[in-house]
């Protein structure tokens, strides 16, 4: 392996760079995990040194994309957002009847659409000053949330390692009619629990997620326990896979479990 799993497994605390390296290599992630930081102080936000800021207004999905795929540290505030759903979920504005009109397509019922809107996870109204997204491996601050775009079997392994690392036997998630990424971040932050949801219309079309992936969110304070469990488990079994016999290199090798026709023997 290119990664020294044995050495990492002996460390009491991993750096964010080591966490990212372990997760990207062992889970075979397609994208960088994204560290998300919420700024509640205007001065702290203004003084934060980012590599990039949005030019035109963007969605949260597009802003996170720059960290997930282009390795940039980005900061943004309400003035940078064109996505009304994100403004509401991040507490930059209050929910309104006008916003309900855009939700009726999900319910075919205006009153129930309003109920669905008001049930979304939201950060405290008027408190957030801005936010940062950065590749986990180069985050300059402790993240509030770590956001990942993963396939189903990657999610399976990540969440199982969360369970093992945090000693929490089951997990439950929050799905809303849209606002998958912004609402997913808000719910993870508010509840301090992992979250997983499908793409919404915005995250599918604006977030460059065309391959049917899932959105996954881990509380920032828990990412060390998750990554630590991953490297300890891999060191014990020889590989990260939990599918079939443990210890294979690829998490989610696409073969039938215990199929007698898929069997290898030593070469002569």
Range-by-range predicted roles:
Residues 3-268:
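Acidic, serine/proline-rich low-complexity intrinsically disordered regions
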């Amino acid at each position: 392996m290119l990664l020294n799993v044995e050495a990492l497994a002996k460390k009491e605390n991993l750096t964010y760079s080591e966490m990212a390296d372990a997760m990207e290599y062992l889970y075979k992630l397609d994208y960088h995990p994204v560290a998300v930081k919420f700024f509640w102080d205007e001065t702290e936000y203004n003084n934060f040194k980012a590599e990039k800021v949005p030019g035109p207004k963007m969605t949260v999905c597009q802003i996170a994309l720059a960290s997930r795929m282009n390795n940039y540290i980005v900061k943004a505030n309400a003035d940078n957002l064109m996505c009304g759903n994100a403004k509401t979920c991040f507490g930059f504005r209050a929910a309104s009847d006008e916003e309900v009109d855009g939700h009726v397509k999900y319910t075919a019922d205006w009153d129930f659409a309003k109920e669905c809107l008001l049930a979304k996870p939201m950060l405290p109204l008027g408190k957030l000053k801005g936010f940062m997204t950065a590749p986990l491996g180069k985050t300059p601050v402790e993240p509030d949330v770590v956001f990942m775009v993963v396939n189903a079997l990657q999610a399976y392994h990540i969440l199982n390692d969360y369970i093992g690392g945090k000693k929490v036997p089951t997990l439950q998630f929050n799905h809303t009619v849209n606002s998958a990424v912004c609402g997913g971040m808000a719910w993870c932050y508010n509840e301090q629990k992992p979250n997983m949801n499908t793409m919404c219309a915005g995250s599918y079309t604006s977030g460059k997620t065309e391959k049917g992936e899932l959105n996954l969110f881990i509380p920032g304070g828990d990412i060390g326990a998750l990554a630590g469990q991953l490297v300890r488990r891999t060191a014990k079994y020889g590989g990260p896979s939990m599918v079939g016999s443990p210890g294979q290199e690829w998490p989610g090798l696409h073969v039938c479990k215990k199929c007698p026709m898929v069997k290898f023997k030593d070469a002569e």
